Amino acid sequence: MEKIINQEFGGERPLYCRHDLYLENVKIHAGESALKETGNITAVHCQFEGKYPFWECDGFVIKDSLLTVGARSGLWYSRNCEIYDTIIDAPKTFRRMDGIKLKNVQIPGGTETFWDCRNIVVEDSVIDRADYVFMHCENVKLTNVKLNGNYSFQYAKNVEIRNCVLNSKDSFWEAENVTVIDSVINGCLLYTSPSPRDRSL
């Protein structure tokens, strides 16, 4: 595995389509798609400032790092992602992804985060300002998570929530197969499946 340590990159696609990389103390400055279409990437003590850093990637681990507000829409169309001890300050993270694991992650601005994703595990994390989080997601497991945001889990399927606190009104709209264990939910719950449009008059 190639190591890139104590370096800085910017502009368009500086590490495009690279594989088997270990990044340590690397800064990705303003630009786009720094690691697009990469695979088997490990990033430790890194900072991501440019847009769309991890698009269409397969197999990457992020540890003890920061995705700034500038790294918006940062992780889309990717697979097999693990993130530990990291702050994701970027909006609209995680779209159409398969295989996401988060542990001890802070997401201060989580609005429209986790859309159309599947096979998600989130542990020991905080998701704030997270309206419409987990929309159209499937196979979601949350353990010891605090979530602040309304309209969560719309149209979600196969959701397990354990030891969590959800401050979320109008959650679980049209959701299917939801299990909540040893948790607190503050707000209205809306289970309305099947859809009213499918009911006979």
Place the predicted regions along the sequence by residue.
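Solenoidal tandem-repeat scaffolds enriched in leucines and small polar residues
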Residues: 95-96, 100, 109-141, 146-155, ...
